[in-house]
Regions:
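Extended catalytic core of nucleotide-activated donor transferases of GT-like folds
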Residues: 75-154
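Conserved catalytic-core segment of nucleotide-activated headgroup transferases in glycan assembly
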Residues: 48, 193-279
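Short internal beta-strands
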Residues: 61-70, 162-165, 257-261
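Structural loop-to-beta junction motif characteristic of Rossmann-like glycosyltransferase folds
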Residues: 310, 326-333
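Active-site-proximal region of nucleotide-activated glycan assembly enzymes
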Residues: 130-195
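C-terminal amphipathic helix plus adjacent low-complexity
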Residues: 343, 356-437
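N-terminal pre-catalytic "stem/leader" segment of glycosyltransferase-like enzymes
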Residues: 2-107, 434-437
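Donor nucleotide-activated moiety binding/catalytic core segment of transferases
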Residues: 271-324
Length: 437
């Protein structure tokens, strides 16, 4: 059997070098070991999967990437697995045709669909057809509000969905009922959040009150964490870069950084229009004061969340990572807080501020009450117990056989694939015809 080169979309069975086939060493809590096989399609989902599996004791985890248009580059993969059990290990890339063989070779108790909806649907459809099938679990790689019925439909065959806050559990339980996708909604902290108890602003006293959370001095490094989808309008993105340029121009001893998720030409989970790379280049061409002092940063976010730094964003999960480390954090309020911007949860957090605050380097931190209710709940090992129960049910052949859901999933996948190969004018004409019936 041949051994795939790094990044080569081919899998040749279980006989592979240790760096490819062996699961990382297990952490033990005296529980019955379970086998989890994860399939990801993008950098953000790979990061979530490897961090999640690295936090679970008594788990034999194996991680694969599936070949697809948003497959991460070697640099993106290295950044995604940094600090996890998969750091410095090869992540095999498989094709869709390899899925059944991969699952058969490793006989997992649980298949983790850590990927975008259409890929999860393919993975779960393949796994569900096995005799004594594995349990099927999915989730999102960051903040999951608002809950999407479309996302639930792609995951129709799942047995459980992992949510990351009490509000998310409630929202996805409701979405499950409305979409008629029966599944358990499990609660877990986002795996990159590792603070003991509630995070506290670094260098602040335990008695500090919310007004004291705002930094008095400008940060040494002001990091902006962008998102592919929001804000959508170029004018709004230009306003963000303008505020960063004003900060850089007014604070010569500080640094402003746009922490990019990918380099030009690389793919992300979501397509980005009006990239900050292009906008910053335009600002520099027009000689906007301070634009030349804005840096573009690449690599793991953790490299940027250091003492003396502060983070600003519109709604990125990076805000939670920053808060977790006690770093001053600001959610930009100029564009509002709503479902479209994916940032409703931060309204009233105590960590919101304007672009004028960004330019001034006046960055705050969330209220303790908000932290306790949103994403920073206590960790009690319940997720591992829930997964252990699912694994036991899978081993005993007690998982449901959802024949009707299987049919719906196949039909959805056929429609999705036809949509990708059918010319847009034909699809548009077909939709107009349907509306006239």
């Amino acid at each position: 059997m041949t051994i795939p080169e790094p990044g080569e979309p081919h899998y040749s069975g279980p006989i592979m070098p240790p760096s490819l086939s062996d699961a990382p060493p297990q952490r033990s809590a005296g529980l019955e070991p379970i086998r989890i096989l994860s399939v990801s399609d993008s950098e953000s989902y790979l990061k979530w999967a490897t961090q999640l599996l690295s936090t679970l004791p008594d788990v034999e985890g194996r991680v694969f990437l599936i070949d697809n248009p948003i497959l991460p580059t070697d640099e993106q993969i290295a950044g995604a697995v940094a600090g996890t059990d998969w750091e410095h290990r090869e992540v095999p890339v498989i094709s869709r045709a390899d899925l059944a063989q991969v699952i058969a070779d490793h006989s997992p108790d649980i298949v983790l669909g850590a990927a975008t909806g259409p890929i999860v649907a393919q993975v779960f459809l393949t796994a569900h057809t096995r005799t004594n099938r594995p349990a099927l679990v999915s989730g999102l790689p960051g903040m999951g509000l608002p809950a999407s019925g479309k996302g639930m439909n792609y995951r129709r065959l799942m047995d459980a969905f992992i949510a990351h806050s009490f509000a998310e559990v409630a929202a996805y339980t409701e979405a499950s009922a409305q979409s008629q996708v029966p599944c358990e909604v499990l609660l877990a902290r986002l795996p990159m959040l590792r603070s003991e108890g509630l995070p506290q602003l670094k260098n602040s006293s335990p008695e500090a009150t919310p007004p004291d959370y705002v930094t008095e001095a400008a940060p040494d490094t002001l990091v902006f964490a962008p998102q592919a989808k929001v804000p959508a309008e170029r004018v709004d993105r230009e306003a963000v870069v303008a505020a960063l340029a004003e900060f850089a121009d007014g604070h010569p001893d500080s640094t402003a950084v746009i922490k990019m998720r990918s380099r030009p030409g690389e793919f992300e989970t979501h397509h980005e229009q009006h990239s900050y790379f292009e906008i910053l280049d335009d600002f520099r061409t027009r000689r906007v004061p301070g634009a030349e002092r804005i840096e573009l940063g690449y690599g793991p976010l953790s490299d940027f969340l250091t003492d003396g730094s502060a983070l600003v964003t519109v709604s990125s999960t990076a805000a939670l990572e920053s808060i977790d480390r006690g770093i001053p954090t600001l959610l930009i309020s100029d564009f509002g807080f709503n479902a479209e911007l994916l940032n409703e949860v931060f309204e009233g957090s105590g960590a919101t501020g304007t672009l004028a605050d960004v330019a001034a380097g006046s960055i705050g931190f969330p209220d303790p009450e908000w932290l306790a209710e949103n994403y920073f709940h206590a960790q009690d090992g319940q997720l591992r117990r829930d997964l252990g129960l699912l694994a036991t049910r899978a081993q005993a052949g007690q998982l449901p056989n959802r024949r009707s859901a299987l049919f719906k999933q196949k039909r959805m996948l056929i429609r999705a694939e036809l949509r990708t190969v059918t010319p847009a004018p034909v699809v548009s004409a077909y939709r107009k015809l349907r509306r006239t019936r």
